[in-house]
């Protein structure tokens, strides 16, 4: 049995999702989003770090899995997204958790079968797999998608995705 925390980093909203993985079964433990809009950027990074650290301390995951930063036409946005990702990852580093990172295309390919799938398709698949209400936010479903992807990869090492 392993607890996996998935993170969808963002400089305004960071999603998180925690699942319990046992061989071929998954159970949703907790998920949500950290909303950061009203704070200056440095304060947002601190909030991400503290919130993720507290979540990790509470649920004691074996794996920390984060969605890879993708290239954007706006260098400033990429830099801020990278810093948000680092703030979350630093919490895992400081707590000695195994860290993995997956590209969005790989997550979509594994969950939906199409690396170019739309966010709504991913959300619907996540809700189906975990028996969740479709009212969860996109950031939350993306974070759960990262965690589910890791579950599939560690339990199907012999398969090529």
Curated annotation (Swiss-Prot):
It comes from the Bacteria. Its EC number is 3.1.21.10. This is Crossover junction endodeoxyribonuclease RuvC. One of its GO terms (cellular component) is cytoplasm. Homodimer which binds Holliday junction (HJ) DNA. The HJ becomes 2-fold symmetrical on binding to RuvC with unstacked arms; it has a different conformation from HJ DNA in complex with RuvA. In the full resolvosome a probable DNA-RuvA(4)-RuvB(12)-RuvC(2) complex forms which resolves the HJ. It comes from Wigglesworthia glossinidia brevipalpis. The active site is at residues 8, 67, 139. It catalyses: Endonucleolytic cleavage at a junction such as a reciprocal single-stranded crossover between two homologous DNA duplexes (Holliday junction). Its cofactor is Mg(2+). It holds the Pfam family RuvC. One of its GO terms (biological process) is DNA repair. It is found in: Cytoplasm.
